[in-house]
Amino acid sequence: MSKIVLLPLDKRPCNYIYPQLLPTDGINLCFPPKNILGKKKIAGDFVKIKEWLLEETKDADFLVISLDTLLFGGIVPARINHLTLSEIEDRAKVVTLIKQQNPQIKIFANELIMRCPSYSLSDEEPDYFDLYGKEIFRYGQIVDMENQGMMTPELAEEFESLVKFIDRNDLKDYLDRRQINIAILLENLHLVANKIIDFFIIPQDDSNEFGFSSVDQKKVRDHINKYHIENNIIMYPGADEVGLTLIARAINQINNLKPKVLVCYSSSKGQFVVPSFEDRIIDETVKYQIYAIGGIRVDACAECDIILGINIGSQMLTKNDKRSDTVYGKNRNLLTFIDYLEYGKKLNKIVGIADVAYCNSADEELLILLRNQKMLYKIDAYAGWNTSSNTLGTTLSTLSCYNCTRDEKKKTEFLTYRYYEDYGYMDIVRDVINNEILTLEGSTRFFLGNNYDLILKKAYDLLEKHMKTHFLEIYDKVDTMKVSFPWNRTFEIMLDLTFKDK
């Protein structure tokens, strides 16, 4: 049995639980103990992570590793740490040690370009982002525009006002950290050139057309071109789905498969949409995602192994936008979309849906149509959570793994998790409890405080009731459900489902 060792980005469900739910029958997928991983702003234990990695990779065939976890202790600590470049370089040597003790192991790594969100909130950023996060983001945009020869007198004047507004020491702290993070990323590219890392994904978390992320992307591209390592390093929007993607790539290599993927959109204009928090049209990201799993895109249904259905309108809007009728009504045809996917199943194709019509939740209209057409469990994968790239990677990885393993039990269970979480919680329940939190003293949606148990019970009751009332086919597969808020906020929920024997 082939062994894949995973060091995830952190221990949130999307990084720690989702990989365990993949249809991976016949694969020994090895995870670190949760207690050595970080939690939000608390970094993971480097010493214990190093010990665990060196032990578990001795006899492993593949290592899927988040370098943000190894080097910084997790996705958020990478944005707030005060490690020196020398300290980080010492930690990076662990990757070479792993290859030295097991020269046959294939190492698939990922390392993020540090994000700079466009809003003022310190929930996952340095504390001073509460004061001027939006202004730091704008500062980065103007720096990028100047680098690209787009500076104007108006932008120069705005830049001067930003410099005066942002505390000098805080800005220096932020810029110094970005400089160190990109420096170590560029150094780690040499691990690819030196055959230590076999495949490297550089995801862009919350990217934008202009800004710090764009500046760092150019540095990475220049470095890749300089050392001629283009084939084994790719860079595209994403973050929390990348562990799934690299597991799928490993399983394809284990089975010597290169899955052929047909892409179908619910809107003819959908492929040209630039999703929220991303810097390019979705179809360009789809190409990278297919390449990342080790697949190839094809245009004919007859030759494909997998049909990736992408539910999207002619734009990506929020739920209550007044343009919804045009974007999701006139410019999209869900009936023919579902009809085509059903046709694919009749041809024995593996079929899944990446539900990216809205950011951060599922599309209820799609779920109702799938229910009415008896398609909820005819499809082989579904996701509709957080960003477009998160959803695309989750769906595609699940389809790819199922193509290799035909693990029916896990396939059904993962579908159920996604319907409960992406639709039931994120689309229905979360808004209700967020509105109720406004009436509770000492709680916000970013910190539940003393009302944690009260809010958790409310979430459980609402989720249980909604699925039982409106999606009985899904509800009937579940025996017990436990819920928790892993980061003490409402943005994500952790589900623990047990299933009825059928």
What are these regions (language model features)?
Residues 1-502:
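An N-terminal assembly and electron-transfer interface module characteristic of large anaerobic redox
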